[in-house]
Amino acid sequence: MQRTKFCTLTRLFNMATGLETVPKMENESEMIGCFPYDEETTDVVIRVDNKRLHLSRGTLMQASPVFRKMLSSNGKENQAEITLPEKSYEEVILFLRCISPREFVKLDEESIDVVLPLAHEYKVKATLQKCEDWLLTEIKFIVGEVTGHTKGTQEKVEFFAKCLLYGTKHDLETLYVRALELLVPYKLSRYQHTKFYKLLPDKPKSQLLETRMVKIEKTNSIVDGHFSEEEEEIGEEGEEIEY
């Protein structure tokens, strides 16, 4: 109990003084991420930045094949402590909260930026799927201009470029295909200088530009934003994006 209070106060102080930035939480209770010792359930410790997080071996091993391997030393499930080097304590806490059955994390764009790379690294399929579903839903809201989700053209294009990058880096096929479809109508100048496009490997860059060129040739129209419905029908005949 004392350890939990100390961790909470320390985090609140750091956040208030600008020493620490973390994704937005819904309320103060969600900021408690110290995973204190529980004599009935704790049987493994994860050490990050010389801080100890007390967790359940079974939960970690069921969620992640990577954790399963780390906790099995020479095929024997006897590892009592594992260290995650070069990881952010705050980011690991948020990630672990996403896979803990006793926690609920309401995802948003900021938290996904943190959680998605870790979920991919540790191969946590359930969390990867949740992140992809959230991003696809957000795309649907943005395209439909749902209140609270509207974005300016440039902001919208950058979000689609981010989704294309995430789909590429984290093997999210549905997200990749949808983001590519949405970027095709826009001119290269809209996104070529964004950090997300610059981080893309050559293959998706080529696919994006080639798909746009094919669409332009089929419709005989150079657009920036969207092709007309008639042009879309002509351009989509027999056309399928490969991942």
Place the predicted regions along the sequence by residue.
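Short, low-complexity cationic-aromatic patches
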Residues: E86-E91, G167, D171
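Long, highly charged low-complexity segments enriched in Glu/Asp and Lys/Arg with interspersed Ser/Thr
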Residues: D202-H226
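N-terminal BTB/POZ boundary and linker segment
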Residues: Q2-T59, E90, L94-I112, G225-E232, ...
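Post-BTB helical module
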Residues: P101-T194
